[in-house]
């Protein structure tokens, strides 16, 4: 049995004069054209013609090879002088069971790493020989065949970019192409295996030239040889062109390579012209995933003509003129299905201008005109255009809002006698209803249903109760809905949120209502925390003013609003709806109490600061306590500032400053807690060692403020240049796949918590022994009391409560972890005041004496005021020795290590 095989044979042919037969035979599968000049009069065109030759067995294949070697005479079917300069067999295929299996001939390979038809073929590279398998059913056109090894190169010519370089038929294009190719051929002609070089592209950025070298050796060998000749190639090019130094590059693998944009290395950015029939240009950037369009202004030439026509009739516009413009616009878009970024912007601009002129001249629109407008909107709201909308909104931030406003304005121009009307497109639904007596008894109902990506239907329902129409009747009610608007109207509110339902707009002209109900289907079931919102055209953002959530089920959300506009709902991902409100209130209440407690703590410390200096242990402890209180107070204030800043509205510098200072001062809190823990460990372990106070303080302040400042500055310097320092939704350190500066807070904080936990265990171990003189049955009780007091004091002072944050990270959906973490840390300032000040025996006694003194002074003042003759009285002054043992020695029989520990903890 014989199996039919297919052989692909490209022939390179030169022909002078007219294109003739060759151009007619070019089916677009793999045609290359190089323009040069011969004797300055006759352009020479080089074509690559692909022939598919079928053979049945290896013998026939050998016969064909011998034939191809002899094939040198011009083909008689070509008109005009012509010559075949090269014939090469590149790819062979065999058909098996409905599949086509193809492989490359010797010294050929697949470029780029796909084969034949990228849509219907799969390249297998795991075997000894890479093969291309295609389904014969879907195979249409072959694009990528086996080719010789390729090396790509690029360089810049330091000249202003002439627009004619985008026209391959121009003399300027021929001048640069021929000159560059001749110089490169001369430089590479001695390279082993070199076959050809051709200019593939010109791009803006001075003049950026891309070229391609083809050879018969392996790709690594060809690349190495071309790199060795780089200096010679640059010298040759500079004889004719001012090549920029440092711009010459060659590479064997192009991260980005496409027919439209050519090749480039990562982060290359170029401006290229739009395709034929469009005006404008595109800016593309090479990323790891390939070429990405960053800016685009490609507009159909017909749309530009329509803009000119509108400008000409603007002063004398009529209803017929509006109808004609809208009809022409609809026809143009139907004939050109491509929705470019430039086309989107132009269509929005045209419709907006038509709407403004119609309103200014009190024009009405016909049913046909309105239908054309809805068809145009349905075309540009295609979900396939969302990527282009995203690019457009980078420069024209109000484009989507302007389109929504325009559709509402044009809808208001339809006369009431033309209603009812209903237009249902794939991406927009429109319904106009004349108001009659029925609305007074039944109210108003609007229902829509759409599908997104063949999923379950997405529904929306608007209901206005009958009592809203009792006093008077409006003429019309118009409602429209779209799913696409939810993707293109920007989300500016803080937090991760998406529009999770259709956007529904309801218009009633010259009429006000006090209540409207809207029911939305959820697009994504895993989103929670629904918020009923409307689109604020003046602020260009979603707002919840006048709207409230009535009910939520598994699949729907019911909203109630007190005004009419465009409504939808915002929802956040993967956060239990019960967590955020509870934690939010705990945080705000806790921070308020903490700030007040910390201020009170600092006031008390300042009142009795002199008394704390009499003992080095007491003094160092209070210095740590004051710095913890100051840092936590400032950190809480900056936290509140960060919580009130909207990153999407406020200048980015404000948010960056809030993130930096919040990060710095919270780190300072932890590092001062570390200093406190180290000092406590020092007093426990090195009982008889005494360090100078200045040395202690130098170490303390370097750790307490130096380390946090260094970490904060490095974090900012490393991540801010790439705009990955802060989150986009809230003012706090970022956490994303590409950048995780939040680790600069989490890692130091949890490390310090772990260190301080060890210190607490040391304290408890030191306390776990009976005091001298106590009976055995009293030992356990006394020890337990001392350990309990110490643990109560040390837990908030050393930041151990932050360890519960691990629970929130391990199980973010557990309400208990979130509430516990918020309770313990939002009230941390209050705990420091209670356990650091009120449980401090000495400070408590000083405060008590101060209050007693004030009370005595008030009583004396009253007595003096009532007596006619007063006798001088001497108030009892505070005697620090009066309370000896209550602070310094809690157990007179303990060892010196216990005395020091008691002084430091001051809990007795």
Swiss-Prot record:
Name recorded for this polypeptide: Adhesion G-protein coupled receptor F1
Region feature (GPS): 532-577
Extracellular compartment segments: 21-588, 644-658, 719-742, 811-818
Function: Adhesion G-protein coupled receptor (aGPCR) for N-docosahexaenoylethanolamine (synaptamide), an omega-3 fatty acid lipid highly enriched in the brain. Ligand binding causes a conformation change that triggers signaling via guanine nucleotide-binding proteins (G proteins) and modulates the activity of downstream effectors, such as adenylate cyclase. ADGRF1 is coupled to G(s) G proteins and mediates activation of adenylate cyclase activity. Also able to couple to G(q), G(i) and G(12)/G(13) G proteins; additional evidence is however required to confirm this result in vivo.
Primary location group: membrane
InterPro entries: Adhesion_GPCR (IPR051587), GAIN_B (IPR057244), GAIN_dom_sf (IPR046338), GPCR_2-like_7TM (IPR017981), GPCR_2_Ig-hepta-like_rcpt (IPR008078), GPCR_2_secretin-like (IPR000832), GPS (IPR000203), SEA_dom (IPR000082)
Region span, Stachel: 566-574
Record gene name: Adgrf1
């Amino acid at each position: 049995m014989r199996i039919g095989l297919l052989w692909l044979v490209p022939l390179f042919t030169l022909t002078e004069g007219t294109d003739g037969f060759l151009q007619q035979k070019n089916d677009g599968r793999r045609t290359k054209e190089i323009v040069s000049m011969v004797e300055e009069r006759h352009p020479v065109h080089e074509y690559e013609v692909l022939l598919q030759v079928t053979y049945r067995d290896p013998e026939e294949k050998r016969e064909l090879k011998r034939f191809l070697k002899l094939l040198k005479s011009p083909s008689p079917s070509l008109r005009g002088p012509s010559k075949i300069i090269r014939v090469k067999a590149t790819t062979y295929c065999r058909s098996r069971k409905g599949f086509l299996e193809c492989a490359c001939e010797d010294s050929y390979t697949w470029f780029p790493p796909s084969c034949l038809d990228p849509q219907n073929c799969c390249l297998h590279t795991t075997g000894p020989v890479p093969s291309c398998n295609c389904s014969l059913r879907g195979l249409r056109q072959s694009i990528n065949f086996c080719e010789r090894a390729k090396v790509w190169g690029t360089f810049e010519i330091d000249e202003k970019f002439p627009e004619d370089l985008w026209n391959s038929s121009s003399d300027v294009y021929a001048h640069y192409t021929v000159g560059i190719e001749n110089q490169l051929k001369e430089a590479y002609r001695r390279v082993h295996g070199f076959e050809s070089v051709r200019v593939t592209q010109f791009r803006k950025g001075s003049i950026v030239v891309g070229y391609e070298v083809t050879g018969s050796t392996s790709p690594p060998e060809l690349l190495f040889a071309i790199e060795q000749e780089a200096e010679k190639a640059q010298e040759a090019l500079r004889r004719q062109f001012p090549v920029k130094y440092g711009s010459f590059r060659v590479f064997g693998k192009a991260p980005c390579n496409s027919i439209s944009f050519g090749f480039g290395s990562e982060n290359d950015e170029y401006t290229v012209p739009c395709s034929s029939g469009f005006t404008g240009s595109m800016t593309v950037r090479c990323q790891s995933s390939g070429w990405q369009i960053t800016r685009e202004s490609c507009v159909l030439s017909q749309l530009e003509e329509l803009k000119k026509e509108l400008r000409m009739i603007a002063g004398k516009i009529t209803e017929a003129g509006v109808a004609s413009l809208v009809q022409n616009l609809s026809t143009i878009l139907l004939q050109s299905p491509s929705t470019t970024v430039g086309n989107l912007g132009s269509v929005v601009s045209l419709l907006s201008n038509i709407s403004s002129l119609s309103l200014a001249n009190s024009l009405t629109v016909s049913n046909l005109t309105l239908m054309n407008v809805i068809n145009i909107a349905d075309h540009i709201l295609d979900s396939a255009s969302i990527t282009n909308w995203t690019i457009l909104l980078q420069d024209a931030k109000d484009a989507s809002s302007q389109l929504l406003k325009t559709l509402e304005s044009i809808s208001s121009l339809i006369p009431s006698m033309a209603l009812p009307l209903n237009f249902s497109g794939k991406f927009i639904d429109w319904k106009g209803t004349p108001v009659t007596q029925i609305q007074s008894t039944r109210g108003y109902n609007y229902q829509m249903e759409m599908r997104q990506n063949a999923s379950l239907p997405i529904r929306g329902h608007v209901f206005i109760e009958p009592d809203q129409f009792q006093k008077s009747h409006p003429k019309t009610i118009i409602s429209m809905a779209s799913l696409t608007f939810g993707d293109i109207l920007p989300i500016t509110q803080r937090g991760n949120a998406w529009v999770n339902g259709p956007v529904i707009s309801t218009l009633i002209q010259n009429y006000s209502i006090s209540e409207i109900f809207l029911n939305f289907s959820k697009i994504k079931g895993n989103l929670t925390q629904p918020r009923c919102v409307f689109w604020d055209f003046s602020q260009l953002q979603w707002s919840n003013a006048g709207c409230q959530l009535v009910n939520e089920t598994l699949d729907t959300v019911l909203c109630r609003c007190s005004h009419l506009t465009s409504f939808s709902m915002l929802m956040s991902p993967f956060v239990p709806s019960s967590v955020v409100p509870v934690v939010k209130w705990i945080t705000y209440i806790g921070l308020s109490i903490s700030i007040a407690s910390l201020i009170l703590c600092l006031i008390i410390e300042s009142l009795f600061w002199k008394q704390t200096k009499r003992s080095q242990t007491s003094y160092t402890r209070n210095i740590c306590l004051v710095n913890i209180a100051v840092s936590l107070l400032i950190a809480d204030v900056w936290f509140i500032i960060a919580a009130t800043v909207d990153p999407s509205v406020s200048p980015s510098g404000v948010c960056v400053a809030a993130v930096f200072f919040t990060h710095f001062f919270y780190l300072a809190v932890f590092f001062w807690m570390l200093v406190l823990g180290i000092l406590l460990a020092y007093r426990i372990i090195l009982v008889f060692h005494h360090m100078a106070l200045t040395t202690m303080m130098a170490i303390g302040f370097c750790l307490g403020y130096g380390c946090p400042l260094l970490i904060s500055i490095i974090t900012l310097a490393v991540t801010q240049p790439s705009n990955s320092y802060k989150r986009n939704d809230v003012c706090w350190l970022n956490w994303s796949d590409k950048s995780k500066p939040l680790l600069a807070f989490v890692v130091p904080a949890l490390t310090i918590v772990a260190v301080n936990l060890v210190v607490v265990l040391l304290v408890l171990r030191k306390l776990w022994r009976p005091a001298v003189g106590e009976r055995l049955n009293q030992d356990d009780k006394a020890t337990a009391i001392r350990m309990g007091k110490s643990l109560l004091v040390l837990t908030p002072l050393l930041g151990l409560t932050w360890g519960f944050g691990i629970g929130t990270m391990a199980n973010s959906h557990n309400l208990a972890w979130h509430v516990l973490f918020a309770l313990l840390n939002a009230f941390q300032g209050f705990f420091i005041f209670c356990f650091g000040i009120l449980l401090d025996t000495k400070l408590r006694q000083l405060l008590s004496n101060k209050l007693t003194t004030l009370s005595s002074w008030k009583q004396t003042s009253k007595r003096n005021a009532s007596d006619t003759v007063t006798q001088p009285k001497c108030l009892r002054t505070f005697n620090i020795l009066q309370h000896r043992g209550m602070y310094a020695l809690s157990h007179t029989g303990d060892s010196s290590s216990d005395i020091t520990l008691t002084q430091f903890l001051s809990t007795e």
